[in-house]
Each structure stands twice: as structure tokens, then as C-alpha cells.
Design a protein with these regions (language model features):
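Inter-motif core of Ras-like GTPase G domains
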Residues: 62-64
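Switch/connector loops and helix/strand junctions flanking conserved nucleotide-binding motifs
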Residues: 18, 73, 99-103
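C-terminal helix of von Willebrand factor
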Residues: 113-127
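Conserved TIR/SEFIR loop-to-helix hotspot centered on a Trp-containing motif
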Residues: 68-86
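Conserved N-terminal substructure of TIR/SEFIR domains
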Residues: 1-58, 88, 96, 127
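Structural motif corresponding to alpha-helix initiation and N-cap regions
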Residues: 46-49, 77, 117
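Glycine-rich, charge-decorated loop segments at or immediately adjacent to ligand/cofactor-binding or catalytic sites
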Residues: 98-112
Length: 127
């Protein structure tokens, strides 16, 4: 049986459906990858950044779903920057075919991959 990785999924709240699809793919017996979703599913109290940092640090990697909503998603932007600051491996994937014209600082200049099973598998294989 393949190792299950602890993966934090970072997404704009408007893109919660994409997170659900990604997690569903990870549970599909036909996909070549499997992971335990560690994303924030409900808003935390005022100490959410502390709780979130702890959760991110406890993960093997982070998958960031990038869409036009990302640029204004302050929580997602913070999560991505946190993962980079903590040295957590990050895979950025496009959430759809509509490529964002504007990207927030943590994403600018970084490779954003197509959402494919091969790309996700390759990322998990490196963890």
C-alpha cells in the first residue's frame, strides 16, 4: 500500500468546490496518488494564524489551488507564504483553464502546474 502523505490544501474560499474535487481525486481508487487532506475547513478564532502555522508545519507538503480568486484571498496568500517560510514543499496548480492575470507576491515568479494526476503524483513522490 502506498504511503499516505499529510497535505495541506490551500485555496480561496470561493474555490472550496475545487478543494473538494482534489480531495475526492485523492480518494479515488483509480488515481495514482493518495493523501490526507489537512486544509482549514472552518474559520478559526483570532489565533487562526498560530493554529494554521502549526497545522502546515505538521504536513509533508502543501498543494495551492490557484485561480482568479487567489489574488484577493488573504487567508490563502498567508497560508502559501507560511509554507514557504517554514520550508514546506509546495505544489501550485491551476484550478481551471482561466489563468489569473494578477498573482499575489507568494506566487509571483513561481511555477504553476496544470492540475493533472501526473503532476500531483510527481510532487507526492518527492515528499
Amino acid at each position: 500500500m502506498a504511503k499516505k502523505f499529510r497535505v495541506f490544501t490551500s485555496f480561496a474560499i470561493e474555490d472550496a468546490n475545487l478543494r473538494t474535487m482534489l480531495v475526492g481525486q485523492g480518494r479515488n481508487k483509480n488515481t495514482p496518488f493518495e493523501f490526507v487532506d489537512m486544509s482549514v475547513k472552518e474559520p478559526w478564532d483570532s489565533a487562526w494564524k498560530t493554529n494554521c502555522r502549526t497545522k502546515i508545519k505538521g504536513c509533508d507538503g502543501l498543494i495551492g489551488i490557484i485561480t482568479n480568486n487567489t489574488v484577493k484571498a488573504s487567508g490563502q496568500i498567508w497560508e502559501l507564504q507560511c509554507a514557504y517560510d517554514e520550508g514546506i514543499p509546495v505544489l501550485l496548480i491551476y484550478g481551471n483553464d482561466d489563468r489569473p492575470a494578477n498573482l499575489p507576491d507568494p506566487v509571483k515568479g513561481r511555477r504553476i502546474n496544470l492540475w493533472t494526476w501526473d503532476n500531483i503524483s510527481a510532487f507526492l513522490d518527492k515528499l
